[in-house]
Amino acid sequence: MAPVGSIVLDGKATRDEIFVDLKQRVAKLTEAGRTPGLGTVLVGDDPGSQAYVRGKHADCAKVGINSIRRDLPADITQAQLDETIDELNANPDCTGYIVQLPLPKHLDENAALERIDPAKDADGLHPTNLGRLVLGKDAPLPCTPRGIVHLLRRFDVPIAGAHVVVIGRGVTVGRPMGLLLTRRSENATVTLCHTGTRDLPALTRQADIIIAAVGVPHMVTADMVKPGAAVVDVGVSRVDGKLTGDVAPDVWEVAGHVSPNPGGVGPLTRAFLLTNVVELEESKLA
């Protein structure tokens, strides 16, 4: 529970608002004979991946998007995976799709992601689309960074001119996060920190916004946070079988805004996966 004065960055409530909007937009597309379709490629029987995929298709049902599932055995070859990707690239009912990660170790994840048609890249992580983001060109945006920006705006956290410290340089959050936040529409100043950063607390104490995306339990503590700063908790790890974020509980006593984990960024990642698919279908009518 957040103490008095600390505002919860509520991802679930914000997701529900997005779903109301998406349901109306999908209904218009359906009237035009263009119901969007989200595809998923799931390899193997990892329980976490299965749960994520189930959740994505449940979200589709809520807003009227068609679901296209391709569930493959764990011992599939790279060539067989390529065939599935090629089939979805050519499938007119599939507006956009994702390859659920991680893949089994014998498969080349980068090769699989690069094989996705950039025009059907629901995750916004194809190298072509990341390049378009660098160039400031329209393309599907990475879902988690886009969700974080939306969440901050929804709760009136000032972004323009803010000093944002991003902890973590992964391709799904850390690296593209800086690209989104330094666009002219956001105009933040970003410091990207990682395992090689010297004196991380000295940097985080300067930050107006901290985005923690590392997967190290409770690594961001109250003494690292400037009073009143916004703290976004993205990282997920398991401690004694329980999902745990990167942000320690005592941060709630100092920060002005904090995203819970779970229940903060995760729901928006899924919401913007659907948003990307709807926007891809809408762009065909433009």
UniProtKB/Swiss-Prot annotation:
GO terms for cellular component: cytosol. It comes from the Bacteria. Its EC number is 1.5.1.5, 3.5.4.9. The keyword Transcription regulation does not apply. It catalyses: (6R)-5,10-methylene-5,6,7,8-tetrahydrofolate + NADP(+) = (6R)-5,10-methenyltetrahydrofolate + NADPH; (6R)-5,10-methenyltetrahydrofolate + H2O = (6R)-10-formyltetrahydrofolate + H(+). InterPro entries: Aminoacid_DH-like_N_sf, NAD(P)-bd_dom_sf, THF_DH/CycHdrlase, THF_DH/CycHdrlase_cat_dom, THF_DH/CycHdrlase_NAD-bd_dom. GO terms for molecular function: methenyltetrahydrofolate cyclohydrolase activity; methylenetetrahydrofolate dehydrogenase (NADP+) activity. Pfam families: THF_DHG_CYH, THF_DHG_CYH_C. Pathway: One-carbon metabolism; tetrahydrofolate interconversion. Gene3D superfamilies: Leucine Dehydrogenase, chain A, domain 1, NAD(P)-binding Rossmann-like Domain. NADP(+) binds at G168, R169, G170, T195, V236. Keywords: Amino-acid biosynthesis, Histidine biosynthesis, Hydrolase, Methionine biosynthesis, Multifunctional enzyme, NADP, One-carbon metabolism, Oxidoreductase, Purine biosynthesis. GO terms for biological process: L-histidine biosynthetic process; methionine biosynthetic process; purine nucleotide biosynthetic process; tetrahydrofolate interconversion. Homodimer. Belongs to the tetrahydrofolate dehydrogenase/cyclohydrolase family. Catalyzes the oxidation of 5,10-methylenetetrahydrofolate to 5,10-methenyltetrahydrofolate and then the hydrolysis of 5,10-methenyltetrahydrofolate to 10-formyltetrahydrofolate. This is Bifunctional protein FolD.
